[in-house]
Amino acid sequence: MSVCYRPPGNETLLSWKGSRATGTAFLLLAALLGLPGNGFVVWSLAGWRPTAGRPLAATLVLHLALADGAVLLLTPLFVAFLSQEAWPLGQVGCKAVYYVCALSMYASVLLTGLLSLQRCLAVTRPFLAPRLRSPALARRLLLGVWLAALVLAVPAAVYRHLWGGRVCQLCHPSPVHAAAHLSLETLTAFVLPFGTVLGCYGVTLARLRGARWGSGRQGTRVGRLVSAIVLAFGLLWAPYHAVNLLQAVAALAPPEGPLARLGGAGQAARAGTTALAFFSSSVNPVLYVFTAGDLLPRAGPRFLTRLFEGSGEARGGSRSREGTMELRTTPKLKVMGQGRGNGDPGGGDGGKTEKDSQEW
């Protein structure tokens, strides 16, 4: 692509020293936290083969760690780019690296949306628990996620260009192309997935708070986890997509107007906001550690598998134990399981019933 639309001012990704410094710091911190964190998640879940089959949630978390880890492996390239103010690879490398980044971005947000939908169904439709454990369903969902990510990431490679042999950044043939590409990326990679996450967790929290144990310790723990996931997702991706929208509006504005000049500012700020989005790939393992609570000292390195074993979805045996947490959120079943030796499917231990619910 020989001719590129450029906003007034001719700013590039490297124009602002502050954005470069912020971006470098976020990238280094993301790699420091995210590479070992996601590696640990892959190590914990990849070889875990419970008798009843790996829970769908665990499979989604595994692929989320793979997607996040893949993009974090590219951080040395971006650190070199920002610190040396020159792209270390050529034109082909420019397109290929940003394609992998976009692929990881779409896979991560789609997997996050699926994970929130799975949790919502597990709470509101517990009778679907056997189907949610189906390996065939997991394979179909994952195939759909990765195929969709492969297709949605194509524009990131098409519109990347090496400017002056030094700067790898977006290159659109016209303002209309720029506005369409940036708006579509924000719609498919933020607005729709984030809306799904918010909707699913809103329904989940409403259902859990309606349960008798929803105001206790587990209600607080689940509420904090949900809030952390949604807050991290929104805060870390919002600046990147705000720049997208700013540049999309600026591209369609009159060339001499103030909005058009804001497009150049957005271009210069993109290095920092992109690095902040990278940081989102390192947050999930940290959230898993905080979610584990007292499982961490008791289960040690295997706390993650114990966390999913306690979710009820991983349990084998009788069908009455499928979706244990979800079924026991209803007031009626909660009363039935309060006493010892009363025929409770979990073995007649009321304390164990409460403990199982709290481990979800």
From Swiss-Prot:
Extracellular-side segments: 1-24, 82-96, 162-185, 246-275
**GO molecular function term, any single one:** leukotriene B4 receptor activity
Query: Which residues carry attached sugars according to the database record?
Result: N10
GO CC term (a single one): plasma membrane
- An example of a Gene Ontology BP annotation on this entry? signal transduction
**Entry's InterPro entries?**
GPCR_Rhodpsn, GPCR_Rhodpsn_7TM, Leukotriene_B4_rcpt, Leukotriene_B4_typ-2_rcpt
Q: Please explain the role this protein plays, according to its UniProt record.
A: Low-affinity receptor for leukotrienes including leukotriene B4. Mediates chemotaxis of granulocytes and macrophages. The response is mediated via G-proteins that activate a phosphatidylinositol-calcium second messenger system.
Under which name does UniProt file this protein? Answer: Leukotriene B4 receptor 2
Q: Which organism is it from?
A: Mus musculus (Mouse)
Q: Which gene carries the instructions for this protein?
A: Ltb4r2
